[in-house]
């Protein structure tokens, strides 16, 4: 893998938000599709239609919002080949790696937590593995949304391709709303400010504070 020195977070100017997931209605509300959910909310909020683009192997849209041009992408390749779609968009528009923000689910974070970073490894996520492989670098921003680990005897694939329990749905809605705010903060105020503002939040409780006053303590076939 080509080693590219990550840019400082203050240098990053976002051009594209990528949400990861699996295509098809049977996967629409699964844990593994949290990235799709965020991009869908951004598209609705910004009035940007998402259209299937064969050249990008994904649903793509662009328009003006927050005072500038915004691009959104949902790879339709299934999770394990997400990098093909992201690479195609970067090549077509000549975008810098550091201008891409990837949104995806993360089992290492509990439901109710989210985490912004300027770079990093795939952490076992197959969609991120594919993107890192196709981009040849880990030096791009990402927003991880916690979905928690499997409970009891449930396996990993069953967990990430499973839906949210009714008791989890309220927390999920809060997380998705705050994820949209975090993306907009990245665009308007920069990644460093967004990291400081949103990474400490714990949205898991019924009275979770969204202002930071309640911080947390110090997969062709549907693919996982």
From Swiss-Prot:
Example GO BP: protein quality control for misfolded or incompletely synthesized proteins
EC number: 3.1.1.29
Pfam families reported in the protein's UniProt record: Pept_tRNA_hydro
Marked site positions, Discriminates between blocked and unblocked aminoacyl-tRNA: 22
Recorded catalytic activity of this chain's protein: an N-acyl-L-alpha-aminoacyl-tRNA + H2O = an N-acyl-L-amino acid + a tRNA + H(+)
Role summary: Hydrolyzes ribosome-free peptidyl-tRNAs (with 1 or more amino acids incorporated), which drop off the ribosome during protein synthesis, or as a result of ribosome stalling.
Name by which UniProt lists this protein: Peptidyl-tRNA hydrolase
Source species of the chain: Synechococcus sp. (strain JA-2-3B'a(2-13)) (Cyanobacteria bacterium Yellowstone B-Prime)
Gene (UniProt): pth
């Amino acid at each position: 893998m080509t080693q590219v020195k990550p840019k400082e977070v203050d240098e990053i100017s976002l051009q594209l938000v990528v949400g990861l997931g699996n295509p098809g209605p049977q996967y629409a509300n699964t844990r593994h599709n949290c990235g799709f959910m965020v991009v869908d909310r951004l598209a609705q909020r910004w009035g940007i239609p998402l259209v299937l683009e064969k050249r990008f192997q994904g649903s793509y849209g662009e328009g003006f919002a927050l005072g500038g041009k915004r691009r959104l992408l949902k790879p339709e390749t299934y999770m394990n080949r997400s990098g093909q779609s992201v690479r195609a968009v970067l090549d077509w528009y000549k975008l810098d790696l550091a201008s891409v923000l990837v949104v995806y689910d993360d089992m290492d974070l509990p439901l109710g937590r989210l985490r912004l970073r300027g770079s990093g490894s795939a952490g076992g996520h197959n969609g991120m593995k594919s993107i890192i492989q196709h981009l040849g670098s880990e030096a791009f921003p990402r927003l991880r949304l916690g979905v928690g680990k499997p409970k009891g005897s449930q396996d990993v694939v069953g967990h990430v391709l499973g839906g949210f329990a009714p008791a989890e749905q309220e927390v999920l809605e809060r997380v998705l709303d705050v994820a949209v705010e975090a993306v907009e903060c990245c665009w308007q105020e920069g990644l460093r400010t967004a990291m400081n503002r949103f990474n400490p939040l714990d949205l898991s409780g019924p009275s979770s504070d969204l202002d930071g006053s309640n911080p947390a303590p110090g997969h062709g076939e549907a693919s996982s």
